């Protein structure tokens, strides 16, 4: 067994203060015949923020999409290995991927509000999925949880697309919250935002982790160090055909990752020697 595999397995059995919400065991991801991500072993602790960092093309977003089977929507994508969500193998043929995505919501890199009113951005999906409660209360609660209610409460009929970029991203977070998820996946949620909006989203994440597990892909190492409880460092390696493929190198508490990483690769990346 390689050092990398041993290190991953050691990381996967770390005693988190919270139980694992996801167990990743030997996951590989292919795009067509290309092996894009190799042999990942990882435990995701509940009600904490986990950051995925690493250079472009290292598999961060590829793994993130595995957690709610968004890779199913990519032609030719194939996932091998076991990925358990609260003791259920989510790649079992009996798992309903649509229901899974209600429990494991996703916020994308660029804000993508529906071309509808602010109110309908929140109410549309719950209504379409048979929500029987009070929609007005759900809309207000979701917007409050996303720390945007006070900014939009007097213009709920206005288009969501008319909001600023930072407001749109918080609206998208509110939209995800409205589906009552267990986990929130965030794929570089601040990459298109200005510093003030970025700070607002980071502060929101710190509040939301009291109720949700948050897994965040970020190219901003300072962001990872500010908000994450745990950090996973990914890197690339050259395969036998000269192509780069992604791998998980190290998974550690964030303070340890940024002060005394276990691997030379992580140390060199964090110190700015590459990436």
UniProtKB/Swiss-Prot annotation:
Subcellular location field: Cell inner membrane
Protein's membrane topology: Peripheral membrane protein
GO molecular function: ATP binding; ATP hydrolysis activity; ATPase-coupled phosphate ion transmembrane transporter activity
Record-annotated membrane-spanning stretches: none
Key words, A-Z: ATP-binding, Cell inner membrane, Cell membrane, Membrane, Nucleotide-binding, Phosphate transport, Translocase, Transport
Domain ABC transporter, chain residue ranges per copy: 22-261
Protein name, UniProt field: Phosphate import ATP-binding protein PstB 1
Native organism: Trichormus variabilis (strain ATCC 29413 / PCC 7937) (Anabaena variabilis)
Organism lineage: Bacteria, Bacillati, Cyanobacteriota, Cyanophyceae, Nostocales
Gene name per UniProt: pstB1
